[in-house]
Amino acid sequence: MSKKDYYKLLGVDRNASTDEIKKAYKKLALKYHPDRNPGNKEAEEKFKEITAAYEVLSDSEKRAGYDRYGHEGASGGFDFSQGFGSAGDFSDIFNDFFGGEFGSSSRSKAKRSTTGVPGADLRYDLEITLEDAFKGIQAPIHYVTNVKCDMCQGRGSEGATKPVQCHTCQGSGRIRTQQGFFTIERTCTTCYGEGEIIQNKCKKCNGSGRRRDEVNISVSIPKGIEEGAKVRVSGKGEAGAKGGKSGDLYVYVKITPHKIFTRNKADLHCKVPIRMTLAVLGGEIDVQSIDGAKIKVKVPEGTQTSTKLRCKEKGMPYMNSYARGDLYVQIIVETLNPNNLTKKQIELLKALEEEENASIQQQSEGFFSKVKKK
């Protein structure tokens, strides 16, 4: 770190009072603090410089030495050789100076550490049918995860023995070391922030309070659930360590493609082939709905292929509702295959073609006669 003028670094003149120096430092420290500038090396370097300047100028003896002999006269100083570490360490360093502006106090951190380590949330991918999504089901779920140890009931200790206070940190879970102007606070390396040590560890879980095992549960999948939706099962994730809270299980739903129906939210769509004569003359067709019931669908005269006929409230149920979406039946008019026709049917079609040709001829002659008159 380059040796710059401490007064210029803090933006004060050489006759500034201690209060003026403190105010200037606080303003700059808030601006360049690593917590407010994550990953910014320039801000980190600036912060180191102003901190070193403040440590000297806020101390009357060091300031006098600096004013007389420069940097060589300012003995001591803060050791920056170890870097800043985590942002959480500096939250504790500045708590007293800035009134907790950079995070919670060390006391609250120690308190949290004694509650154990929470378990992770888990994800389970469940594939169901469209019929399952229509009616809702109780789905059996099987997975392997860390569960609470049944021998020590999650305590981690053997028998009735209880954890004892960590002798290194005296139960706080944090270790404080003095470095010049600052008090550095870090996680205790003996108890790893727990504040206590298990002397007689459970033989089954080795003191962790949990073990690997299979889990079998039944999960309620509501009717009307859509593709990609997730169902949260509270407390069925990974068990916490040292008595920590268990995570949650998230069941993500995938719906198997259906042979007949496609889905758009609560609406269903299907394609139904009909005879050409039915499309021309009109009539009724039977369509099976998703619940297995038969629906009578009216086909209007002159229906063209790709026409969609709507069946109200015959689709999927809406989530948490008694209402249902609609079913849309797309008509596909089949072309007649001469190989499947009888001789009489072919004769009738030929007669129909002759009739149509005669009608078209008359229409054409009438059209051209009108053109000639013009």
UniProtKB/Swiss-Prot annotation:
Recorded GO MF terms: ATP binding; heat shock protein binding; unfolded protein binding; zinc ion binding
Protein's cellular compartments: Cytoplasm
CXXCXGXG motif repeat residue numbers: 149-156, 166-173, 188-195, 202-209
Main location: cytoplasm
J domain location: 5-70
Pfam families: DnaJ, DnaJ_C, DnaJ_CXXCXGXG
InterPro entries with a match to the protein in the record: DnaJ (IPR012724), DnaJ_C (IPR002939), DnaJ_domain (IPR001623), DnaJ_domain_CS (IPR018253), HSP40/DnaJ_pept-bd (IPR008971), HSP_DnaJ_Cys-rich_dom (IPR001305), HSP_DnaJ_Cys-rich_dom_sf (IPR036410), J_dom_sf (IPR036869)
Residues that, per the record, bind Zn(2+) 2: C166, C169, C188, C191
Primary role: Participates actively in the response to hyperosmotic and heat shock by preventing the aggregation of stress-denatured proteins and by disaggregating proteins, also in an autonomous, DnaK-independent fashion. Unfolded proteins bind initially to DnaJ; upon interaction with the DnaJ-bound protein, DnaK hydrolyzes its bound ATP, resulting in the formation of a stable complex. GrpE releases ADP from DnaK; ATP binding to DnaK triggers the release of the substrate protein, thus completing the reaction cycle.
Oligomeric form and interacting partners: Homodimer.
Domain remarks in the Swiss-Prot or TrEMBL record: The J domain is necessary and sufficient to stimulate DnaK ATPase activity. Zinc center 1 plays an important role in the autonomous, DnaK-independent chaperone activity of DnaJ. Zinc center 2 is essential for interaction with DnaK and for DnaJ activity.
Protein name as it appears in the record: Chaperone protein DnaJ
Organism (species): Wolbachia sp. subsp. Brugia malayi (strain TRS)
